[in-house]
């Protein structure tokens, strides 16, 4: 059963039995809201020993350069060291700017990642990949650069 967690600018759900965390941005965006939200998610990942993480980027306006730097230089290296994290499902919106920003961030940090990352066009496919593991994620979006599968 999913528990709703609360944070000002995020919709958060946690399933303790699956060790799964889902989050999606809500509301307006600025660095003063984004950075504490990212830090809160990072704290939950460690505190709750999350193994399966869904980051839904729908609703997130264009990421500022300062926030991209924060994620790539501080957050991602710390998250990469979490031994319990197994899979990250990124649900991408149709916002091409954010798709490219995420691709760039993960490309730079890819050498440090110890968990699987897949991109999806919808949350249902992301949940399916996490809770029904297979060798080849058939519902994953093939490439961010090629766009999203509807």
Residue positions per predicted region:
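Amphipathic, Lys/Arg-enriched alpha-helical "gate/interface" segment within cytosolic domains
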Residues: 2-150
């Amino acid at each position: 059963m999913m528990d709703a967690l609360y944070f000002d600018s995020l919709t958060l759900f946690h399933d303790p039995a699956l060790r799964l965390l889902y989050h999606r941005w809500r509301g307006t965006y600025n660095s003063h809201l984004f950075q504490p939200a990212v830090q809160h998610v990072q704290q939950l990942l460690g505190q709750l020993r999350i193994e399966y993480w869904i980051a839904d980027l729908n609703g997130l306006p264009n990421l500022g350069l300062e926030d991209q730097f924060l994620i790539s230089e501080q957050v991602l290296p710390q998250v990469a060291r979490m031994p319990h994290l197994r899979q990250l499902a990124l649900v991408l919106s149709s916002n091409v700017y954010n798709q490219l920003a995420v691709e760039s961030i993960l490309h730079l940090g890819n050498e440090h990642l110890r968990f699987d990352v897949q991109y999806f066009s919808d949350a249902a496919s992301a949940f399916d990949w996490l809770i029904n593991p297979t060798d080849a994620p058939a519902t994953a979006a093939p490439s961010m650069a090629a766009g999203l599968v509807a």
